[in-house]
């Protein structure tokens, strides 16, 4: 019907122009009036045909097709009752027929209820109506399946039951669009959001309720989702992520409070790096929520008040529109904060002491916003190169100690070869002042390319005299610095020189005409298996270093938070209220060594016939 409509308008306009030129102004006016009232002949014929077609089809559906019955009935209910009583029969009357004989169906069942339910497929009887959308179904199981599609709509309020008209989830479409689509097509996308037909609401983009259905807070319940004020139609789904920022902050406060409670109850050993890492794992990346860092001043976060998205009465203010978050129960008093700060300090020291295990063999790259806040000494950071030539910037993590400085013995000597024997003073020592048994802590790469040997201050290496040259070792570095085991022989790079680079090619043939041999080109390319092994090991070390770094960041953030609250005195005073002068004589203050003052008129010892028992501490 819609395609021929544009073609009919030019034909009618041409006929009216011809009539107007022949008859005059009056006839043209009458022609225009007739145009607005009289429809096109083709349109009338099509509408008449469409109106008669459903009537004939409905009459055909009300004829009994059971074998050669061909009896006609006025309603589907009468046809259904006729088939059940006349053709199916009953067992009590000894005429039960369990085989469907509608046309050529021949469906056989085992019970009468089964075949009577099957007959609904042939009869246009739909007695089962959906309460949500009003759609009718033939069988109850079909309605049951259909109702499951409205599972997400079970909390919605029907428009007829909503007294305020503006608090339901599914507002009625505007009156101006009733001629396009009286029932807008609703569907759910893959995210579970309710959508509507875009074509039906295309011209209503300026209307607040034309492009989407937004959830509104109900004033009948205490818990609901708040929606921020929205003044324009949006194409993306809204969802329930309006208060995501506040939820993240509340979740962060809960996790920090749980961590403080576990630390106070000594459920976390401050000297165990493994337990500290497991307890800090939930806080990784959560102390910097999208709305800003965790600060001590924000003890409550008010939520925005609900705003109407579409036309209708403004909902009344719900008392739960603003939610106030109380301070942390585990860090309320000054004593709690001091205790937590002490435990955090012990945990921080433990993390520092385990830096050699977490950062072994990891190169600290230069970063623009590097992590330079955790240095042991106030001395300025240094800048040196790792054995691979990578520059270690001053913004990277560099706890400064004597071991992090490049030893003059590892510098290039006058002969152009690096010193072979590593000095004992530049090695990493544990708390027992013995050389670390791990080979990674003794390798030159770990000593200068990472922070494996920065735990304890070591004796600085004195520069040799100029006459000795830089190729000789200092007196303080002579002597064995290893244990007597055979591990020294197979340490793998401890006393071995690094492989020299490829020799320079001869310069007589620079034209490039000759092709290098395969063996020469293969020297510079490692095998894929070795590269994959190295990459996996490197990735594991980097992940371990990232976890260690994140633990240090979390501990520093928590300590800054606790110290900030102590400096601003943001804690609950635990001062006890003064005792009343007319308290009971049996009240005993266990904290005070002195008894409450005796009131005037009380009998002293000896003035009564019975002795007065002294209370403890009196």
UniProtKB/Swiss-Prot annotation:
GO biological process: positive regulation of transcription by RNA polymerase II
Positions with biased composition (Basic and acidic residues): 144-155, 571-590
Compositional bias per record (Polar residues), positions renumbered to this chain: 447-465, 511-522
An example Gene Ontology CC term for this record: cytoplasm
Compartments (UniProt record): Cytoplasm; Nucleus
Pfam families associated with the record: zf-C2H2
Post-translational modification: Activated by C-terminal proteolytic cleavage by signaling protease (probably palB/RIM13) at neutral to alkaline ambient pH.
Protein function: Transcription factor that mediates regulation of both acid- and alkaline-expressed genes in response to ambient pH. At alkaline ambient pH, activates transcription of alkaline-expressed genes (including pacC itself) and represses transcription of acid-expressed genes.
Protein name: pH-response transcription factor pacC/RIM101
Organism, scientific name: Fusarium fujikuroi
């Amino acid at each position: 019907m819609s395609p021929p409509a544009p073609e009919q308008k030019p034909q009618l306009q041409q006929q009216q122009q011809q009539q107007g030129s022949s008859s005059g102004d009056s006839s043209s006016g009458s022609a225009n009036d007739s145009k607005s009232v009289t429809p096109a002949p083709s349109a009338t014929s099509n509408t008449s045909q469409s109106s008669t077609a459903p009537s004939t089809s409905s009459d055909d559906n009300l004829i009994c097709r059971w074998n050669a019955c061909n009896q006609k009935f006025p309603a589907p209910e009468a046809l259904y009752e006729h088939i059940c009583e006349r053709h199916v029969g009953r067992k009590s009357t000894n005429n039960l027929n369990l085989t469907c004989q509608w046309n050529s169906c021949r469906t056989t069942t085992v019970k009468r209820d089964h075949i009577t339910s099957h007959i609904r497929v042939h009869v246009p009887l739909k007695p089962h109506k959906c309460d949500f959308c009003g759609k009718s179904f033939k069988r109850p199981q079909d309605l049951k399946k259909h109702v499951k599609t409205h599972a997400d709509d079970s909390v919605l309020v029907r428009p007829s039951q909503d007294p305020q008209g503006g608090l339901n989830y599914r507002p009625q479409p505007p009156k101006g669009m009733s001629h396009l689509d009286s029932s807008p097509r609703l569907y759910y996308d893959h995210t579970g959001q309710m959508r509507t037909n875009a074509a039906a609401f295309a011209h209503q983009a300026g209307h607040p309720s034309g492009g989407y259905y937004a959830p509104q807070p109900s004033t009948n319940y205490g818990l609901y989702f708040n929606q921020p004020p929205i003044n324009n139609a949006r194409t993306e789904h809204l969802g329930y992520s309006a208060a995501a920022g506040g939820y993240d902050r509340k979740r962060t406060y809960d996790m920090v409070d749980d961590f403080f409670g576990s630390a106070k109850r000594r459920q976390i050993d401050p000297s165990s790096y493994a337990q500290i890492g497991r307890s800090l794992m939930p806080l990784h990346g959560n102390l910097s929520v999208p709305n800003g860092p965790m600060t001590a001043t924000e003890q409550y976060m008010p939520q925005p008040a609900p705003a109407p998205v579409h036309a209708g009465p403004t909902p009344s203010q719900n008392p739960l529109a603003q939610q106030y978050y109380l301070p942390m129960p585990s860090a309320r008093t000054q004593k709690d904060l001091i205790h937590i700060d002490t435990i955090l300090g012990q945990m921080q020291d433990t993390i520092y002491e385990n830096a050699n295990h977490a950062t072994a063999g990891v190169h600290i790259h230069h970063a623009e916003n590097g992590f330079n806040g955790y240095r042991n000494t106030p001395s300025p950071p240094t800048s040196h190169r790792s054995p691979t030539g990578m520059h270690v910037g001053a913004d990277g993590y560099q706890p400064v100690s004597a071991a992090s400085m490049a030893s003059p013995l590892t510098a290039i000597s006058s002969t152009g070869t690096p010193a072979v024997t590593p000095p004992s003073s530049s090695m990493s020592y544990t708390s027992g002042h013995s050389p670390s048994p791990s080979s990674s802590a003794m390798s030159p790469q770990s000593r200068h390319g990472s922070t494996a040997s920065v735990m304890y201050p070591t004796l600085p290496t004195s520069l040799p005299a100029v006459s000795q040259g830089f190729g000789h070792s200092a007196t303080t570095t002579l002597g064995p610095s290893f244990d007597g085991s055979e591990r020294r022989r197979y340490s793998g790079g401890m006393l071995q020189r690094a492989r020299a680079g490829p020799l320079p090619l001869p310069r007589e043939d620079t034209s490039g005409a000759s092709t290098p041999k395969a063996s020469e080109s293969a020297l510079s390319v490692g095998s894929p298996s070795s590269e994959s092994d190295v990459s996996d090991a490197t990735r594991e070390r980097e992940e371990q270093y990232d976890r260690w770094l994140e633990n240090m960041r979390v501990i520093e953030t928590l300590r800054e938070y606790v110290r900030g609250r102590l400096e601003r005195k943001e804690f609950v005073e635990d001062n006890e209220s003064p005792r009343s002068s007319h308290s009971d004589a049996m009240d005993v203050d266990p904290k005070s060594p002195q008894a409450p003052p005796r009131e005037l008129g009380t009998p002293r010892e000896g003035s009564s016939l019975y002795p007065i028992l002294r209370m403890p501490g009196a």
